[in-house]
Every structure is written in C-alpha cells, then in structure tokens.
C-alpha cells in the first residue's frame, strides 16, 4: 500500500513494531509542509522544531516498551482557536490573544497525555465566524484541489482540511458551530465529525457561540475517524472503536426539502449516486420533507444565536478588536448588536422546539443523508466584497447549519467530484449523542463506495 494512504491505526502499529520512528514520520510531514505551505498557507504557526523534539521523546519511550495511548507519535494539526502550551492563539485576528489562552483545555490535554504530536496551529476565519475560510489578516488558505485558481478551502476551520491534503498532519482538530468542521472537510475531500453540544468539552477553545460551539475532528477516511474518536472520546473509554454497520436493512432517510434547493447539479448527481449505491446494497431508502428546516434556517439567516453571542463576548473581552475585524465578520457582529434579549431568547426557544420535533423522525430512520455543501468552493476573487461574500457564505453553511440548530451530531465523507473537479461531501445526520452509531454507519458506507483517495484520486499538488 502507498505509505501516504496508511491509516492512523497502521501508522500506530508500525510505530510500536519499530518499523517506523516518530522522528521519521514528523520529518516526512515537515517535508510536505516545506514544499507546499508557501502555496497552500494552511498554518498560522508551524511548530516543526518542537514537534521533532517531541517525536524523539516518543521514540525513546517506545524503545523502552512504553505505550501512552492510541495517538502516541501521530502528527496532529490544531485549529488556531485551541490553547496549546507555548503557541500563541490569534483566533484569526490581527494580534495574539492574552497568553492565558495558550493553556490546554481538556481535549488538547487528552491528546497530549497520549503524546500525540502537535505540528502547528491552522488558520481559522476570524473568531470562527464564517463558512468559506477567508481571512483578511493572514491570507486565505488555498483549496489544494484547485491548482490553477485560488478557490476557498471552506471554514471556519480553514487550514484543517488543507493540512491533511498537504500531508503535514494525519489528524486535525477543528470546531463546528454551523458547519465549520464539515464544510472544510467536504470542500477538501476529507472526513469531518461534528459532535453533539457537550459531548466534548470546549473549555480552552476561543468561543464563537456559547450555545452551539462543538469540538470536532477532520481525518482522511472514516476508518481514521473511528480510530481518533475512540482515542479522544471519554465516554467510549474501554469500549472498542465504532464498527461498520451493515448497509443491508439500514433505514436511510433522504430529506426532499431545503438541502437540495438551488444545488449545483453535479453535486446533486454525486450524492444521489451514493444514495443509489446504498439502495442497491439493500438499504431501505425513504424520502420525505424534514420538518422545521425553513423555520430554523430563517433564524440562522438573521444571525441565529452565534452572532449575538459573539457580539456579547467581544464586547466583554475584546471591545478594542471590533473595529479591526475583517469586514465580512465585523458587519455581522455590528448587526447582531441590534438583536434584543427578548428576540434572542425567543430564537433559543424556537430552535429547541424545532430540533425536538424534527428528531422524532429518528424513530423511523437510522440516519439522514444530504449533500454537505450545495455549491462548489467559490474562487476567492469572486467573493472579495461584503456583497459578494454574504450569499456565498450563507449557501456554504445552509445544509450543515441544520444539525447545529437542531442539536444533533453529524459528519461528512467524500463521495465524488463536481463539475469543477472539486470534492463533494455526503452529510450524515443523527440524533444527539449518537456519534458512535453514526460513525459505524459511515464505516459501512465507506466499505461499500470506497475511501476518499480511491474515489477522488489525488489533487495536482506542487
């Protein structure tokens, strides 16, 4: 097998058999970074020297027969919202946040206890408030699948998927408030998991929305996602990693409304082809309108909860930053300042009602399938103003935001390429705290249709 396609589990096994050293693995990642980073711009901060020192320490321990956990020695990129000791946190803004933000929160601490190796901090949209991945302060990462035009990578975890395609990391930590893991995963041909609110702690992560923020991961395959989830999820400690669910007899719901509106025909075709493969393999596919989508998305379109919560957070902690925000972020923050407390509380109540009502469908289906993103990643030049950016940003998050607003878990996995030769994602949605089951279903689908590198081929990288 091509070493570039080895799974996390295979890398971990080779490290423990001493067929591979952690230093050699980090050196390979650093070589990929050095060759491609000037073009792709995945990272705000690259920490290659410390990563190599950490790898040498891992090798010493492995030579002594010590094993500190499944992620030991594996290279991980971390979104620049997370605190990582010794690395500045910018949160996509024009200056580093106070040093206290460098403290590791519970999720990074879990990674570090296992001696997973942080190779660097990846770019984010400023304060994570955007779905396309743009950043006016530090530059927008380039989608690796677009060799001749600068297309966006998706956001707000803008550099996360790029780091995986680049080969500088094998696992990426991101966050998801309206699609910020799944949109970049979809647009760069990766797998991305949005956890249920509260499943993984968000302490030690710069907040966007106190109501909706979730920690998540991006991986190259669903197989890798299952491995990483088992390693990071405390509720799964002592349990085996999620196992593939049989496709035959699987009850698959395909919503007919909202998710397919004004969709790129080539994206619709790729997703529908995946659904048909499931039906041919014995899945029971049923189609119906998903209730409350339009009502919930109308709230999202008017700022949802996140805009008001970010405005309040900035006003309390960083009021001096507001006028220096990227204009595509600043305008929405300013607009949210006009939302009354009564309207904010009304929105919360409506969204709770909508999510609970729509979740009753999971009594009759095991999973909901939709396109992850309904449009091809736009060219950066085509979204250079607030007026051109706003509709493209809203459309990018239209399908992913529903699971956030409803309080569900969700993931995306690649299923093909669109007419622009850009990756297409299939979104799986499940009820709250059903992550392990959802990953198992995705494993079954991946076994049927193939992993991303087999489905998509390889991008034309430098």
Curated annotation (Swiss-Prot):
GO molecular function, one term: 2-aminomuconate deaminase activity
Active site: 79 (charge relay system), 156 (charge relay system), 180 (acyl-ester intermediate)
Pfam families hit by this protein: Amidase
Record flagged with keyword Hydrolase: yes
GO BP, sorted A to Z: catabolic process
Enzyme class at the top of the EC tree: hydrolase
Record pathway: Xenobiotic degradation; nitrobenzene degradation; Xenobiotic degradation; 4-chloronitrobenzene degradation
Keywords: Aromatic hydrocarbons catabolism, Hydrolase, Plasmid
Catalysed conversion reaction: (2Z,4E)-2-aminomuconate + H2O = (3E)-2-oxohex-3-enedioate + NH4(+)
InterPro entries: Amidase, Amidase_dom, AS_sf
Entry EC number(s): 3.5.99.5
SUPFAM superfamilies the UniProt entry points to: Amidase signature (AS) enzymes
Function as written in the Swiss-Prot or TrEMBL entry: Involved in the biodegradation of nitroaromatic and chlorinated nitroaromatic compounds. Catalyzes the conversion of 2-amino-5-chloromuconic acid into 2-hydroxy-5-chloromuconic acid and ammonia. Also able to catalyze the transformation of 2-aminomuconic acid into 2-hydroxymuconic acid.
Family designation: Belongs to the amidase family.
Full protein name: 2-amino-5-chloromuconic acid deaminase
Native species: Comamonas testosteroni (Pseudomonas testosteroni)
Gene: cnbH
């Amino acid at each position: 097998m091509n070493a570039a396609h080895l799974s996390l589990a295979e890398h971990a096994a080779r490290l423990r058999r001493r067929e591979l050293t952690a230093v050699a693995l980090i050196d390979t990642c650093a070589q990929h970074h050095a060759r491609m980073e000037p073009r792709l711009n995945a990272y705000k901060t690259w920490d290659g020297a410390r990563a190599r020192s950490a790898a040498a320490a891992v090798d010493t321990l492995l030579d002594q027969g010590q094993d500190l956990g499944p992620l030991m020695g594996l290279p991980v990129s971390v979104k620049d919202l997370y605190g990582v000791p010794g690395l500045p946190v910018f949160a996509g803004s024009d200056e580093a946040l106070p040093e206290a933000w460098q403290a590791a929160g519970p999720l990074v601490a879990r990674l570090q206890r296992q001696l997973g190796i942080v190779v660097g901090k990846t770019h984010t949209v400023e304060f994570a408030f955007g779905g396309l991945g743009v950043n006016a302060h530090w530059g927008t990462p380039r989608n690796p699948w677009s060799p001749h035009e600068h297309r966006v990578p998706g956001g707000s975890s803008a550099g996360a998927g790029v780091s995986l395609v680049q080969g500088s990391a094998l696992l990426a930590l991101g966050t998801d408030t309206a699609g910020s893991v799944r949109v970049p995963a979809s647009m760069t041909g990766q797998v991305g998991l949005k956890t249920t609110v509260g499943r993984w702690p968000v302490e030690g992560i710069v907040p966007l929305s106190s109501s909706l923020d979730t920690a998540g991961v991006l991986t190259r395959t669903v197989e890798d996602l299952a491995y990483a989830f088992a390693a990071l999820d405390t509720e799964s400690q002592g349990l085996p990693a999620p196992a593939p669910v049989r496709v035959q007899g699987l009850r698959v719901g395909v919503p007919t409304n909202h998710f397919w509106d004004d969709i790129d025909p080539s994206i619709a075709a790729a997703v529908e082809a995946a659904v048909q493969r499931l039906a041919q393999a014995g899945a029971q596919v049923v189609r119906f309108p998903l209730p409350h989508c339009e009502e919930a998305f109308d709230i999202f379109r008017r700022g949802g909860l996140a805009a008001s919560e970010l405005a309040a957070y900035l006003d309390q902690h960083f009021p001096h930053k507001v006028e220096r925000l990227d204009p595509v972020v600043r305008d929405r923050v300013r607009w949210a300042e006009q939302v009354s407390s009564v309207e904010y509380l009304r929105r919360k109540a409506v969204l709770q009602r909508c999510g609970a009502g729509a979740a009753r469908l999971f009594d009759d289906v095991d999973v909901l399938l939709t396109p992850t993103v309904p449009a091809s990643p736009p060219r950066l030049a085509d979204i250079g103003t607030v007026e051109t950016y706003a509709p493209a940003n809203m459309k990018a998050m239209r399908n992913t935001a529903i699971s956030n607003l409803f309080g569900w878990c969700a993931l995306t996995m690649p299923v093909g390429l669109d007419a622009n030769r850009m990756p297409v994602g299939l979104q799986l949605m499940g009820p709250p705290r059903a992550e392990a089951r959802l990953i198992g279903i995705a494993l079954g689908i991946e076994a049927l249709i193939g992993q991303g590198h087999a489905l998509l081929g390889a991008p034309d990288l430098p």
